[in-house]
């Protein structure tokens, strides 16, 4: 794809349903942009899009939707854009960080922000001799996304049995994380903060009802709970669960906001969604850092604005700075 010299913006994406509200706003504003669909794409050394700004909205969970080639292609594309000196929002370093839950844990540890104790492994038998192994625990993929392939386990034998029966759990990168189980009230839920730059866009409380797919996009979790989401990821723990609920969180604790800003700044993220939960014993535990932020319009409207308009404002500000 050879872009017009007049092109301002290229949006890299894999799931158009998530990005359509932003595309609608960009169209309304007349911004000269192109959509770069990562599901079926090709580039050569000299034909990358020539735009002043690139906005990476690739998702680590693409493999869950059967799109195993999206992430490797995106990494190659972002690396080439970096070498060419392109201006990329959430570029190669940020995307690589989002792909690695163990790197996120390391960052939280560096910042002295409470996080789940975690062990990364490529063979269940490597866990047997560890003195820091404890159960119950959560099994998660190193490359996560959309709450995919998460399981609560009560013993190492249960882990062995699960992996023997479901070898696909090793996908996509053959690495898994065994993480401290954090009790919390699913009827109270978790908190997600959305950031543009280092500034808070909004915070919301997500009542999980025991579900793991907490994707805020209305394409995944519709406002009308009777509708089925387009990107539902069923799991054994979710069969009888009620739909996820999303609420504006107007009383975000100052310390939680401070920690969120620390993470965004330290990881050099342009756009971010950061999640934490509170345990019965008073811990505030940060456990998930997202660069592909799927915004929820009704939450923004509860704060008095359209969040996709704010993203467009952010992109236009960035365009001004790279003239």
What function would you assign to each model-found segment?
Residues 2, 79-84, 92-191, 254, ...:
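Active-site nucleotide/adenylate-binding loops and adjacent lid/helix of ATP-dependent enzymes
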Residues 10-12, 196:
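Short hydrophobic segments within beta-strands
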């Amino acid at each position: 794809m050879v872009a017009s010299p007049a092109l301002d913006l290229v949006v890299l994406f894999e799931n158009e349903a998530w990005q359509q509200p932003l595309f609608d706003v960009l169209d309304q504003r007349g911004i000269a942009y192109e959509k770069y669909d990562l599901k079926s794409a090709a580039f050569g050394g000299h034909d990358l899009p020539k735009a002043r700004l690139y906005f990476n909205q690739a998702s680590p969970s693409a493999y869950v939707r059967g799109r195993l080639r999206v992430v490797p292609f995106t990494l190659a594309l972002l690396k080439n854009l970096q070498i060419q000196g392109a201006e990329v929002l959430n570029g190669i370093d940020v995307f690589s960080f989002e792909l690695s839950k163990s790197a996120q844990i390391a960052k939280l540890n560096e910042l002295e922000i409470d996080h789940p104790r975690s062990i990364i492994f490529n063979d269940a038998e490597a866990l047997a001799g560890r003195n820091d192994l404890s159960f119950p625990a959560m099994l998660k993929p190193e490359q996560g996304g959309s709450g995919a392939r998460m399981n609560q386990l009560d013993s190492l034998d249960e882990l062995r049995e699960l992996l023997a029966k479901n070898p696909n759990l090793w996908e996509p990168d053959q690495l898994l994380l065994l993480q401290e189980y954090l009790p919390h009230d699913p009827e109270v839920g978790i908190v997600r903060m959305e950031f543009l730059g280092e500034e808070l866009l909004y915070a919301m409380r997500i009542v999980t009802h025991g579900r793991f797919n907490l994707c805020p996009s209305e394409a995944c979790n519709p406002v009308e709970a009777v509708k089925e989401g387009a990107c539902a990821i069923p799991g054994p723990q979710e069969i009888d669960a009620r739909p996820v609920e999303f609420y504006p969180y107007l009383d975000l604790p100052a310390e939680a906001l401070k920690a969120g800003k620390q993470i965004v700044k330290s990881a050099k993220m342009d756009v971010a969604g950061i999640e934490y939960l509170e345990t019965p014993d008073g811990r505030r535990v940060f456990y998930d850092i997202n660069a592909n932020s799927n915004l929820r319009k009704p939450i923004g409207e509860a704060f008095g604005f359209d969040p996709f308009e704010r993203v467009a404002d952010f992109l236009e500000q960035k365009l001004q700075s790279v003239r």
